[in-house]
A protein has these predicted regions:
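Beta->alpha loop/short-helix hinge microenvironment recognizer with preference
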Residues: 1-383
Length: 383
């Protein structure tokens, strides 16, 4: 028997999930997309072999970012486009996290408080790197929001890929060699202060809502106690090892940019009531282990991580801002004496991309090896 997929799990358990929970319109739309992806619901392309007459039908995908069947090619195309943005210089990986006690409030106010995470992380990096005590230069970096832990629990955090140098005010390159140039304790205090200041401002302006387990924070004194507790905690960002070289950076980025809460390869099996999937045990050096939860709980956890509609998860800052990126990166390359890496996929059609990436020849007949003509009929959406 084939291993189950996220789509199989939703087909089996989503109706029972609806008996217990009320998904938001965005969550319901994602569930619909997952269950109907590549089933014919979104139409199909029909090709006929020019040699043997074999008819080949390809069902269309939903192309949604939360669908585990639709991320591979967009990820590769995004990574390929970013080849032109990276430099042969050190890079660092920072992870900004918040205390778990804030999770109920963040989940109730996702768009506002996710944005606040980006603002706090980006302003912390920009201010510290501009300070001559630490670097005194304008750097480039990418911030990516993840909202899940390995067990699909709610765990919002920002991954930041930071260039280990930048342009000083005199337009000269400045770096600190292979060493990380920002003190972690200073990052922690500044990030904590900026995020809690934004949270307090939104609360004072009555822009926050409180649902579910966050209901208790409607009370003025309870919310103030929450803020006081957070100010008293150490918010320790993680700085992971450095890595060099444009190609290494691209591969590293791909691990984070187009991830979803759980991928199909982590699903082990399911039965009439439960789902078993692989999770990382960080108490045991990150070893993989199996976790069993109910099918309804699996669906609930998965849908927790559906971002708000049209929410931008991958954001570029500093030297990578689109307004000045081309000019600034060209200057950096000239100063560093490194070459520009060109996109390989930009001018390719989708059949060429699939063959280049996966060796899939979509224009070759599976029956005789002959040539498949262009789609002669596009089946409409299934009613």
């Amino acid at each position: 028997m084939d291993k189950p997929t996220v789509q199989d799990i939703f087909h089996r358990f989503y109706p029972a999930y609806l008996d217990q929970y009320s998904p938001s319109p965005v969550q319901a739309n994602v569930a619909h997309n997952i269950m109907n992806c590549k089933t014919g619901a979104y139409g199909a392309n029909v090709c006929v072999c020019e040699d043997c007459g074999f008819v080949q039908i390809h069902y269309n995908s939903c192309r949604k970012r939360c669908c585990p069947m639709c991320q591979a090619v967009p990820k590769e195309m995004w990574m390929d486009a970013r080849r032109e943005d990276v430099l042969d210089a050190p890079y660092f990986h920072l992870v900004f996290t918040v205390p778990d006690i804030l999770n109920p409030v963040i989940y109730s106010n996702q768009r506002l408080l996710y944005d606040a995470l980006y603002h706090a992380a980006s302003s912390t990096i920009s201010e510290l790197t501009a300070d001559p005590k630490h670097l005194g230069a304008k750097v480039g970096y990418i911030c990516i929001l993840h909202t899940w832990g390995s067990e699909m629990n709610f765990h919002p955090h920002i991954h930041t890929i930071l260039l280990g140098g930048g342009l000083a005010s005199n337009n000269q390159w400045k770096d600190n060699g292979e060493n990380f140039f920002l003190p972690i304790r200073v990052i922690s205090k500044m990030f904590r202060g900026k995020y809690l200041e934004e949270l307090k401002r939104l609360w004072e302006e009555d822009k926050l809502v409180f649902h579910g387990t966050a209901e208790k924070f409607r009370n003025h004194y309870t919310f103030k106690e929450l803020l006081d507790s957070c100010y008293g905690m150490d918010w320790i960002p993680h700085c992971k090892k450095t890595f060099n070289g444009a190609q290494t950076v691209i591969k590293y980025l791909g691990k984070y940019t187009h991830r979803i809460a759980v991928s199909n390869h982590r699903i082990v099996r399911m039965d009439d009531d439960t789902v078993i999937f692989l999770v990382k045990d960080y108490r045991n050096e990150g070893q993989w282990k199996e976790l069993t939860i109910s099918g309804v709980e699996f669906v609930r956890r998965f849908l927790m991580h559906v971002p708000p509609r049209r929410f931008v998860r991958i954001r570029h800052y500093g030297l990578l801002c689109s307004r000045t990126k081309s000019q600034k990166l060209t200057l950096c390359r000239n100063l560093l004496g490194c070459k520009k890496y060109l996109s390989k996929l930009r001018d390719m059609e989708m059949p060429e991309i699939l063959e280049h990436l996966y060796g899939i020849k979509v224009c070759v007949c599976k029956a005789c090896g002959g040539h498949l003509g262009k789609p002669q009929m596009r089946m409409p959406l299934r009613c």
